[in-house]
C-alpha cells in the first residue's frame, strides 16, 4: 500500500524532521573542492569507509547508497519511511521536497538487500528508515557529519557534502545516455533547465563524433 503524500499531517511531520538540525551551509568554492559531484568509484570508497564506522556502519553505507541511486536531497533521505518502501514490488515511493515531482523508483538488488537487513536490525519499531542512537530520525546535520568524517577517515582529496550524491546521480544517469525528460522525472525537477546541466556535461553525448 503506497503512502498518501497529500496528507497535511504527514507532510508537516516530514517538514519538521527536515528543518530540525539542518546541515551547515556548503561552500561552493573551487579552492575547497574541484567539483560539486562524486564519481561512482569515489562513492564506493565512501561507502566502504562509512561501513567501518562503528555499530551504525551498515546504516551509514545504506544511506549513501540510497541517496546516490535515487538522487535524494538530504531532507528526502532522512525523512524516508518504511511505508515508502515496497518490498513486494521492489519500488520506492520518492516524496520530493521543494515542490518537486513525486515518483516511483525501482529498487535494485543491492538496495533491497541492504534495506531488508536494516529493517531486521531495527528494533525500535519506528516508521522512519534511518534512525539515530535515540531512535529518532537521523537529522540532516547528522548525515552530513557522518559523510564528512567518512571522507576524512580515508584522506579524501576534498571536503564532501550530501548534495554531491544527488549531483552524482544526475551526472551518472546523463552520461549513461538516458533521456533528459526521463531524467527530469527521476530527479523530481519541475523545471527542465535544472536537468539540462547534467546532460550538457555528459561526455557520452559526444560519442561517435570521430570515427578514427
Residue ranges of each PLM-predicted region?
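Conserved catalytic core of the tyrosine transesterase superfamily
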Residues: 1-212
